[in-house]
Amino acid sequence: LGFSVQKARFVSDHLDEAKRQAWITHEWPMILKAAKRKKAWIFFGDEASFPQWGSLSYTWARKGEQPQVKTSGKRKAYKVFGLIEYFSGQLFYQGIEGKFNSESYKTFLTQVLAQTSKHIYLIHDGAKYHTSKATQSFFADHAVRLTECRLPSYSPDYNPIEYLWRKVKKEATHNKYFAQFEHVVVSVEKTLASFAQQAQTVLGLFGFYCREVGLAN
């Protein structure tokens, strides 16, 4: 009958469908065309937190016996900035133990600019440290190399790096116990380093993403 058991997902009640549609039909095609003309890169950026208490997921178990995973209950989390590139599948990332803020974001972007030579179209959401005066000044100062593009509000489903975060959590933290914070860091860094060597896997995320939201790939 075409039905299958699927996990539901939350959808914000603040969605602006007109802006979301405009992104698909107007903004994204313009970015793609401009990037191809300039032979530039298109980076989708986002951040993720990986808490020491781990994360839970489905797993096999005997009927009537719910799996249990030990947890430290500690709320400290390893935070990661990430960018994935649309044409090449390259992954750039930086883990931090501090806070996501304008300064840490600028530091990350500065490192990315130092490691690349092409013009970059950076697509990200409207997080405060993305839109702050300090960050906007950074974009203005680096306009020769960097063009900021903003996703529609409340639209994480329009950012393909979300699929990567899910994969990282599945491999690095799902159903795992971390007695020490350093163990989380090692697990996440190992997983990210692996994906950084799997450009085709990252490119596959873009294909899935484009099919999901109806974008031209």
Residue spans of the language-model regions?
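Short functional hotspots at interaction and active-site rims
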Residues: 1-217
